[in-house]
């Protein structure tokens, strides 16, 4: 009996080894392309592809090459159920849903997860009206989208839907667009690979339909009950690791983040080349557009945006920040710890709040920045980092910074680097005149925590400039002094500034106690030949010209006074002209002072 049981167990083990291996969701995305469990050709297929398991699928199109640019499949890939987490490899598939079909090109439904890999030939996906191209409407489950290096996938959302993410958040059962899973969320979505970024370095293009984000939330919609409106879903918990991502929001929506009247938050960029452009009144990365001012501490503020690597370019549209708030949307908790970041605001901050709104708790370290509030084109009062237009009158602000709130805007380096700035700002001159300054260069030393409070950035000849920077370039550089700075007074723009005197460094610590004495030179008393600053001992004036008296007569006495050096003493002397009587004098030959010739 025992031998029979052992034989049965051995047979079961042999059978199990012959079964295809299924990759489970817990394993995460694959590093390379595997052997597939299922292959499906969509060319001439007349029904949706429905997936309810976690196997690996290869979905391709055998359409002839001469038809590939014009032929499109009009069915969807439907991934359904909380047990589903398939790995779907898509090769050269073009899906274009009819506007009235109510279908995304690829749909995750009923809490499903999915790993989508675009390989081989390029693919294009178009959602129906109200539907995203790749739609994930719930916060449950996760979506990974990866493109093989050399492959491009282009996703376009339908009217009121995201390119990748949420549908139109319509909950009115009487609306023809309605179905039960239309929450408008674009949540818990991942792009690229952390473990094999070079392999998965392809291009993902995502464009939202009107009111929908490129990647993130769809538009708000009605519930169908009088006065009861459901706002747009959330564009949050969005993660970017590798490859190129080009995200463009539809009108009133962010490139990455919130749709119209939808929030954009918890966005994390670890690598890749990310280009995000908002639609009209949408941020590049962050919040969508609102019609009333949102609360800084409320759920609709653009918040918790983290960039630690890669190259990021973000452009906000009218009334919006590049990274942060859309129209009427404040921003908080933005952290950048590396990478190259370019951001442009349009009446919003480059990084921070949209128009009428603050940006708060923004920390940028060990990164390269190129930021602009488009002041030259708009005359906006928005800052490069912090507040949007119409929050402050900048002339009043730089004249009296006490009117401002402490928004905790900080730059620096956690790696012992110096921070180098090139900027344009509005500030007060050394004569207290309000003016615009450009091509201002600074090299700064972070404090013991590696940070620099931008509100402390002031110089006696560009007073309080840290409050109203409009254009900012920032890099971090090695410290030539290795932290052992030769601090002292240096002369800059006819002012004394406490800084490192090493000519290869010249950095300053804006938080140093001695920096409080930075200012215009204070003339001290005259010495015998020199006059110096009473604070820093910088030479201000030097007396090098001897006093001159003209038309001196023989035998008369004169007194000479050196007025320039403050009359240190007066000397009487007698002039002697040795010319004989009747002869013309050839000039004074000697002067006798106090009996000494």
What would you call each of these model-derived segments?
Residues 15-24:
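C-terminal segment of classical bacterial N-terminal signal peptides
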Residues 57-59, 452-466, 496-503, 527-542, ...:
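Append "Rare intracellular matches occur via the same short Y/T/C beta-strand/loop motifs
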């Amino acid at each position: 009996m025992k031998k029979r049981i052992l034989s049965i167990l051995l047979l079961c083990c042999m059978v199990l080894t012959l079964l295809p291996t299924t990759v489970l969701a817990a394993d995460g995305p694959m590093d390379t392309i595997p052997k597939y469990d299922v292959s499906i050709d969509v060319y001439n297929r007349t029904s949706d592809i429905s997936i309810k398991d976690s196997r690996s699928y290869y979905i391709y199109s055998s359409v002839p090459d001469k038809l590939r640019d014009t032929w499109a499949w009009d069915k969807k890939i439907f991934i359904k159920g909380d047990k589903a987490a398939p790995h779907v490899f898509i090769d050269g598939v073009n899906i274009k849903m009819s506007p009235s079909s109510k279908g995304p090109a690829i749909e995750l439904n009923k809490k499903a997860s999915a790993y989508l890999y675009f390989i081989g030939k390029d693919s294009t996906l178009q959602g129906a009206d109200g539907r995203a191209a790749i739609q994930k409407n719930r916060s449950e489950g996760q979506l990974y989208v990866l493109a093989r290096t050399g492959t491009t996938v282009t996703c376009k959302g339908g009217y009121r839907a995201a390119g990748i993410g949420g549908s139109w958040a319509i909950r009115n059962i009487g609306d023809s667009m309605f179905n039960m899973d239309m929450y408008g969320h674009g949540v818990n979505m991942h792009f690229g690979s952390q473990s094999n970024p070079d392999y998965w370095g392809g291009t993902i293009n995502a464009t939202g339909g009107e009111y929908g984000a490129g990647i993130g939330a769809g538009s708000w919609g009605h519930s169908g009950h009088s006065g009861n409106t459901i706002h747009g879903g959330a564009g949050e918990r969005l993660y970017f690791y590798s490859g190129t991502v080009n995200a463009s929001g539809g009108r009133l929506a962010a490139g990455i983040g919130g749709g119209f009247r939808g929030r954009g938050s918890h966005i994390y960029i670890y690598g890749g080349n990310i280009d995000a452009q908002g639609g009209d009144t949408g941020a590049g990365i962050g919040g969508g557009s609102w019609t009333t001012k949102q609360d800084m501490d409320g759920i609709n503020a653009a918040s918790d945006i983290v960039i630690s690597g890669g190259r990021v370019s973000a452009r906000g549209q009218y009334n919006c920040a590049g990274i942060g708030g859309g129209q009427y949307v404040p921003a908080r908790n933005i952290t950048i710890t590396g990478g190259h970041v370019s951001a442009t605001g349009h009446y919003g901050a480059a990084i921070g709040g949209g128009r009428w709104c603050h940006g708060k708790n923004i920390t940028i370290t060990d990164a390269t920045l190129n930021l602009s509030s488009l002041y030259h084109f708009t005359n906006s009062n928005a800052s490069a980092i912090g507040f949007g237009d119409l929050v402050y009158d900048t002339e009043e602000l730089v004249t009296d910074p006490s009117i401002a709130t402490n928004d905790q805007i900080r730059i620096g380096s956690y790696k012992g680097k110096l921070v180098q700035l090139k900027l344009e700002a509005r500030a007060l001159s050394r004569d207290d005149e309000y003016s615009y300054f450009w091509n201002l260069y600074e090299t700064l030393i972070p404090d013991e925590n590696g940070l620099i409070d931008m509100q402390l950035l002031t110089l006696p000849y560009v007073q309080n400039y840290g409050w109203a920077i409009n254009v900012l370039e920032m890099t971090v550089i090695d410290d030539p002094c290795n932290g052992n700075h030769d601090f002292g007074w240096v002369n800059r723009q006819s002012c004394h500034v406490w800084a490192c005197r090493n000519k290869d460094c010249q950095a300053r610590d804006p938080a140093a106690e001695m920096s409080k004495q930075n200012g215009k030179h204070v003339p001290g008393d005259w010495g015998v030949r020199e006059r110096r600053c009473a604070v820093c001992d910088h030479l201000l004036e030097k007396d090098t010209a001897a006093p001159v008296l003209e038309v001196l007569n023989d035998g008369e006495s004169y007194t000479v006074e050196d007025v320039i050096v403050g009359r240190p003493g007066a000397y009487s002397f007698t002039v002697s002209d040795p010319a004989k009587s009747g002869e013309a004098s050839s000039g004074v030959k000697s002067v006798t002072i106090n009996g000494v010739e």
